[in-house]
Amino acid sequence: MQPIYQYAWIIPFVPLPVTMSIGLGLLLVPTATKNLRRMWAFPSVSLLSIVMVFSADLSVQQIDGSSIYQYLWSWTINNDFSLEFGHLIDPLTSIMSILITTVGIMVLIYSDKYMSHDQGYLRFFAYMSFSNTSMLGLVTSSNLIQIYIFWELVGMCSYLLIGFWFTRPIAANACQKALVTNRVGDFGLLLGILGLYWITGSFEFRDLFEIFNNLIHNNGVNSLFATLCASLLFAGAVAKSAQFPLHVWLPDAMEGPTPISALIHAATMVAAGIFLVARLLPLFTVIPYIMNLISLIGVITVLLGATLALAQRDIKRSLAYSTMSQLGYIMLAPGIGSYRAALFHLITHAYSKALLFLGSGSIIHSMEPIVGYSPDKSQNMVLMGGLRKYVPITKMTFLLGTLSLCGIPPLACFWSKDEILNDSWLYSPIFAIIACATAGLTAFYMFRTYLLTFEGYLYAHFQNYSGTQNSSFYSISIWGKEEPKLVNRNLLLSTINKNEKVSFFSKKTCKINGNVRNLMRSFSTHFDNKDTSMYPHESDNTMLLPLLVLVLFTLFVGFIGIPFDQGVMGLDILSKWLTPSINLLHQNSNYSVNWYEFATNAFFSVSIAYFGIFIASLLYGSVYLFFQNLELINSFVKIGPKRIFLDQIINVIYNWSYNRGYIDVFYATSLTKGIRGLAKLTHFFDRRVIDGIMNGVGVSSFFVGEGIKYLGGGRISSYLFVYLSYVSIFLLIYIFFFRKVESIKLFQTKNGIPLYL
């Protein structure tokens, strides 16, 4: 056993000193800590880099054939109950550690510049370091109790990060929504853990799997109860990984800063649910109903996430629903028995999605000086377009991330997604058809996002910022894209008088086709003899460096799953890496597929992706804009019943997507209003009934006491008289009532009448 394994317990705690130091600094020497705030990025990156090197060494040891290592120490020693803590090092742990640290380092470097202007800079890095600590603790946990502790810490960190700008009501509501939604899954996870302990008497993974499998095979446990416990465990993963129907928190989580979105969607919170399913898969595999449930939830999430992304205008929300759909693929894979493909896609998707989110942050950063610092404008793709000329490096990196997510070879996601699609055909043709159709939808909405952002014109220059637009000046294309029709660019880009000092937009008005409209001045504003460009600008090198590094991962990380062994797949790095875990699942560790079969299946999936890209290019690309500007569409396509029916279908799809499938509305009307109504009813019952009884007894006692006080007059003889009077009355009632009852019983006995009559 390598000595490095003995020190693996330190992995989760290495980033923690940053959080503690920032907290103590703000508490003891707040002024000095705030003045030196930019220095905290360096220790954050440095400490996480140490963990990355440590994790890389562990990964190399795993690939070279090291076995699973577990170290435990007892927390409590009792004859009836034993609780042990420790760390578990296996391929799954090493994979997750590499993902968390590499993506985390890129996000921290990026955030140093992105958050430099923010007053919460120190708080941001404290939260980020604590989030990395929580996630590293989760993936190294050796039992379910540790899993649950760090699971809750990850949820708390996501709450703090999503609500980072808590003074904004939308952000405050978003973090509360994420917390409440995840509490549903967390409660199920807790019940499932307690149920499994009741069945097996152990929290340790190895003991738990062995005992549970023996009980299932020997019918030693009620199958319905075992299925219920496993379903409750899976509920925790459903909520944390934003699977249907507990996915509603994910798009609202975009209210946090963009680096937080990259970290949550790539390597931390949403990956935690996938990690839990992968960790407990040996338990799930012995219950066929759970495997069917996992695959069903996965395929529903795949399709739902893709359809909800079709009409989003916010660039971050579009990527959020993309994450939801891709997580559906990752959840589908273990459900159909494809453990290797699930972890493969988890790796490739993490780097591609981190690249896309950080790229979107660069885009937002470049748009904010033009449209303002409101997320409703700076993240709105309707106001973007034509950015390829202004942010070429961001454009190149975003395009590569988009193509990777579309499944275009030789980029990373192609290899992993294609493996899932191939395995789905072996499991269920229906699931395979849905997965393949969603691959086309993925290519469509991802390329739609790219085209709306980087192609065409910069539509912010054609927008008046009162929130309205000239109807004749605009042509609204399919699903929210605003396009100029026969625009005189010289008129729109007319220059201002250099002797004037004005705000961003002129108050002059001019006539355009008979309509009065605010005329935008030249996008160069003069402040104190200094020209400030009002076009987007490329981000700082500190923000571009992580993008370029993630591009390298996107280009080459897919090769870890590609064999180089004369045509039969089975000797690739990933298969060697996962051999101990696959053997634990009692599967054949030699993953072999003929290259000819692989190429045939890949051709089909790539064709679907290219078809989606082609449709997106037709609807949002330069070809569509060319025909629209020449007004040739209506010349060739006559408006008839078929055209009207097609438009109605498009409107239905658009409304479904834009309104989030009406799922949020359903929850708001049924659950939220129902719970509030129940709370009001409970409040009424508590105040009027319970408190009414208590208050009524008190008031009655008060009046009785007052009456007796006035009746007695304060003399002892009067009190004795009243007391004797009450005693006499009770004696008379007793004599009259009980004597009458005894007489009736005696009469019945003498006459032979049953006593119960």
From Swiss-Prot:
GO molecular function, one term: quinone binding
Catalytic activity: a plastoquinone + NADH + (n+1) H(+)(in) = a plastoquinol + NAD(+) + n H(+)(out); a plastoquinone + NADPH + (n+1) H(+)(in) = a plastoquinol + NADP(+) + n H(+)(out)
EC class name: translocase
InterPro entries: NADH_UbQ_OxRdtase_chlpt_su5_C, NADHpl_OxRdtase_5_subgr, ND/Mrp_TM, NU5C-like, Proton_antipo_N
Membrane spanning stretches: 9-29, 40-60, 89-109, 122-139, 147-167, 185-205, 219-239, 258-278, 280-300, 327-347, 354-374, 396-416, 425-445, 544-564, 607-627, 692-712, 718-738
Main location (coarse class): plastid
Membrane topology of this protein: Multi-pass membrane protein
Pfam families with a match to the protein in the record: Proton_antipo_C (PF01010), Proton_antipo_M (PF00361), Proton_antipo_N (PF00662)
Keyword Endoplasmic reticulum set for record: no
Subcellular location: Plastid, Chloroplast thylakoid membrane
EC number, as in UniProt: 7.1.1.-
Taxonomic superkingdom: Eukaryota
A cellular component annotation (GO) from this entry: chloroplast thylakoid membrane
Keywords: Chloroplast, Membrane, NAD, NADP, Plastid, Plastoquinone, Quinone, Thylakoid, Translocase, Transmembrane, Transmembrane helix, Transport
GO-annotated biological processes: ATP synthesis coupled electron transport; electron transport coupled proton transport
Functional note: NDH shuttles electrons from NAD(P)H:plastoquinone, via FMN and iron-sulfur (Fe-S) centers, to quinones in the photosynthetic chain and possibly in a chloroplast respiratory chain. The immediate electron acceptor for the enzyme in this species is believed to be plastoquinone. Couples the redox reaction to proton translocation, and thus conserves the redox energy in a proton gradient.
Complex and partners: NDH is composed of at least 16 different subunits, 5 of which are encoded in the nucleus.
Family: Belongs to the complex I subunit 5 family.
Designated name of the protein: NAD(P)H-quinone oxidoreductase subunit 5, chloroplastic
Gene that encodes it: ndhF
